[in-house]
Amino acid sequence: MQKEPMTIYGYEKLQRELKELKEVERPQIVKEIDIARGHGDLKENAEYHAAKERQLFIEARINELSEILSRTQVVDPATITHEKISFGSTFKVMDLDTEFVYEYTIVGAPESNPDRGFISFYSPLARQLIGKVPGDEINAKLPNGEIDYEVLEVYYKEISFE
């Protein structure tokens, strides 16, 4: 099984979520099912069916998080030099056509949120920018077309997913 890179911040966030699901949500839903079961006929018991559905969701998420965490290689971006774009780097690129400047941070796939500037290590843009330094220009081939970018800055910035 190939290990997937993830920042220490994303790893800790997923661990907290898994702990919450196992120690709080799972026991709570078991109680809710027992209470709903006590209300009689299970065929027409909406509370019972809603609780069972929630239990399925919780168990599926626990399994998903456990699987993700088991194949994670934790990387602390603070320990990496950020002279060139790499995993955990924050960088600014300028669209050479519009002169609009974008700031992105390269993170693991489960952490990615492009709307907040977190792009997956495996995304087409990240793959084309890995190894680039300020001043480099690329013609990025993306799913929605090609964009010419210039790398303006590469640096480390503490990541927060909250």
Swiss-Prot record:
Keywords attached to this entry: Coiled coil, DNA-binding, Transcription, Transcription regulation
GO biological process: DNA-templated transcription elongation; regulation of DNA-templated transcription elongation
UniProt-recorded Gene Ontology molecular function terms: DNA binding; RNA polymerase binding
Matches recorded under InterPro entries: GreA/GreB_C_sf (IPR036953), TF_GreA/GreB_CS (IPR018151), Tscrpt_elong_fac_GreA (IPR006359), Tscrpt_elong_fac_GreA/B (IPR028624), Tscrpt_elong_fac_GreA/B_C (IPR001437), Tscrpt_elong_fac_GreA/B_fam (IPR023459), Tscrpt_elong_fac_GreA/B_N (IPR022691), Tscrpt_elong_fac_GreA/B_N_sf (IPR036805)
Keyword Transcription regulation included in the entry's annotation: yes
Coiled-coil residues: 45-65
Domain of life: Bacteria
Keyword Transcription in annotation: yes
Family label: Belongs to the GreA/GreB family.
Known role: Necessary for efficient RNA polymerase transcription elongation past template-encoded arresting sites. The arresting sites in DNA have the property of trapping a certain fraction of elongating RNA polymerases that pass through, resulting in locked ternary complexes. Cleavage of the nascent transcript by cleavage factors such as GreA or GreB allows the resumption of elongation from the new 3'terminus. GreA releases sequences of 2 to 3 nucleotides.
HAMAP family tied to this protein: GreA_GreB
Cross-referenced NCBIfam families: greA, PRK00226.1-2, PRK00226.1-4
Protein name (record): Transcription elongation factor GreA
Organism (species): Wolinella succinogenes (strain ATCC 29543 / DSM 1740 / CCUG 13145 / JCM 31913 / LMG 7466 / NCTC 11488 / FDC 602W)
